[in-house]
Amino acid sequence: MRSLIAMYQRIGLVPLIIIGLVLGVLIGWLAPNVGIALGLLGTLFVGALKAVAPILVFVLVMAAISQHRSGNEVYVKPVLIMYMFGTFLAALTAVGASFLFPTELVLVNAVIEQVPPANLKEVLTNLLMNLVANPVQAIAEANYIGILAWAIIIGFALRQASDTARTVVGDFSDAISQVVKWVIALAPFGILGLVANTVAETGFEALAGYARILMVLVGCMLFIALVVNPLIILVKTGKNPYPLVFICLRESGITAFFTRSSAANIPVNMNLARKLGLHEDTYSVTIPLGATINMAGAAITINVLTLAAAHTLGIEVTFASALLLSLVATISACGASGVAGGSLLLIPLAASLFSIPNDIAMQVVAIGFIIGVIQDSAETALNSSTDVLFTAAADPKYAR
């Protein structure tokens, strides 16, 4: 048994994930029943990540702040600026792509269980109310805005505690981090189960009818990941951005693509930030915050599908209305994590700017759920990998 574990560790996590990915595709394609059964591995893996992430964020932030000493620099502000700027550029990119490659949708009738927010005020209100949630409830419901708020408050309070108390908090933080490493080590099995189940259940035919809209969506996300984000990093650091970009895509993006959950990928990003040698005082705050408000992929989804609906209905989109849509998408995307259904349920809000009827907007949402196996995966991979990318760029390790 020890020799097997040693061999498993020697191969490395990324090669094992690739092996799991290939095996998952083959099993899901050739033996669908086995693929569906293996889906339990993926469910358990995502469940374990989601279970450990809230307590990890709470303890890590609390420990980092309680042990912070005046004079130790933190780099949260520049990361937040990059989050917002990057999301706005993603929204503009989606608008440009929608004009270059106008897409018409074959609308479908479907029942959407979730209720979309009525207006932007409701989105922002939900986001602010998350700040004052009960701390135990926030951890139980993975409300990261609430978790961060309480962890910061308690962390400041613990600065007045004895050295022994702060040491205990630090030791507990180290213990939770070790648990996260053990969970992440099981990623190849989780990816195997997730991929096998997805291929077995959806196949490849279901997405063929939506190839054009998928190409626009994924093309925008690739453009942000491989062109726009590197330009932001180049301006910020003055260095070749691609080594860091590819590290983040490989170590964070691949896992996020298959888990389809920014929250579940928080432990993965925390582990990567630690491997990169970044300041814990910074990444313990910016990474969970990024999982909540850094939503470039969501902004792309909102704009592309909204403008596709406008093109389908023959609605003329002016430059001013497109710019307004980008601003609304940027702000709305920041609240996407607080809306059931995420970015897709914010489409009716954006569609209202063009007086698109709500029943049509909900049909567009239904299309979003159909293509979600690709759209949501790519969106999460972009969002989550960008969290650690921008955090690293703001760190002196990657400064000029």
Curated annotation (Swiss-Prot):
It catalyses: L-serine(in) + Na(+)(in) = L-serine(out) + Na(+)(out); L-threonine(in) + Na(+)(in) = L-threonine(out) + Na(+)(out). It is a multi-pass membrane protein. It comes from the Bacteria. The chain crosses the membrane at residues 11-31, 45-65, 81-101, 138-158, 175-195, 213-233, 242-264, 295-315, 327-347, 354-374. The keyword NADP does not apply. GO terms for cellular component: plasma membrane. Coiled coil: none annotated. Keywords: Amino-acid transport, Cell inner membrane, Cell membrane, Membrane, Symport, Transmembrane, Transmembrane helix, Transport. GO terms for biological process: serine transport; threonine transport. It is found in: Cell inner membrane. Pfam families: SDF (PF00375). GO terms for molecular function: neutral L-amino acid:sodium symporter activity. Belongs to the dicarboxylate/amino acid:cation symporter (DAACS) (TC 2.A.23) family. Involved in the import of serine and threonine into the cell, with the concomitant import of sodium (symport system). HAMAP family: Ser_Thr_transp_SstT. This is Serine/threonine transporter SstT. The gene is sstT.
